[in-house]
Amino acid sequence: MKFTFCLTVLAGTFFSAHSSVQKDDPSPYLVYLKSHFNPCVGVLIKSNWVLAPAHCYLPNLKVMLGNLRIRIRDGTEQTINPIQIIRYWNHSHTAPQDDLMLIRLAKPAILNEKVQPIALATSTVKPGTICMLSGLDWSQNNNGRHPDLRQNLEAPVMSDTACQETEQGKSHRNSICVKFLKVFSRIFGELAVATVICKNKLQGIEVGHFMGGDVGIYTNVQKYVSWIESTTKDK
């Protein structure tokens, strides 16, 4: 199955998987949530815990870490089953708010240069800050269902006021918005910009069906740090 992409975004530096130079960007905290349904991206926050959007709660879920390249193996590849999945207590399928879940791995991930947890943001980032949007993409020769590249781009964070004035931002609370400088339109485009990383900390994680035009809406992770820490403590 071949996915066809339409990419028309310019927001700082983007290392497109369809450019002449393909490379795997350094984002060792990203994990691929593999299932028989739509692809999803999660973030390793501890060696045995992954933070992900709650809408990624799918049957037969497997957590893939390390190298994702199909034809190139380097020994960092890991596939771990979830042993426990905890959705945020207030999450609802009928509303986009609180779209978070925690995945407890059956065993701790083996940390290496391509598998590393990332710290959580504990404060709100200032509007105008240039942050990195980190996600997964398909390489040019990948005709399969699953992404095989980590890709990064840069984009500025919007103010809360500007966010609430957008069509998407009106219906989201506890959110952070970023500005795509040109329209971003592609199949499974949310995978390529799945997380917001500011000052080397996880600031945002994508909300289901969050993109429209030139704005991306993300769950503001720092609003949920207390829940995350209490849930994962000593486990």
UniProtKB/Swiss-Prot annotation:
Domain Peptidase S1: 20-233
GO biological process: binding of sperm to zona pellucida; cell migration; germ cell migration; positive regulation of acrosome reaction; positive regulation of fertilization; protein maturation; proteolysis; regulation of protein processing
Localization: Cytoplasmic vesicle, Secretory vesicle, Acrosome; Secreted
Source organism superkingdom: Eukaryota
Disulfide bond found in the keyword field: yes
Alphabetic keyword roster: Cytoplasmic vesicle, Disulfide bond, Fertilization, Secreted, Signal
A single cellular component GO annotation: acrosomal vesicle
Species of the source: Bos taurus
Name of a matching Pfam family: Trypsin
Listed name of the protein: Probable inactive serine protease 37
Task of the protein: Plays a role in male fertility. May have a role in sperm migration or binding to zona-intact eggs. Involved in the activation of the proacrosin/acrosin system.
Family as reported in the entry's similarity comment: Belongs to the peptidase S1 family.
Signal peptide (UniProt feature, chain positions): 1-19
SS bond partners: 40-56, 131-198, 163-177
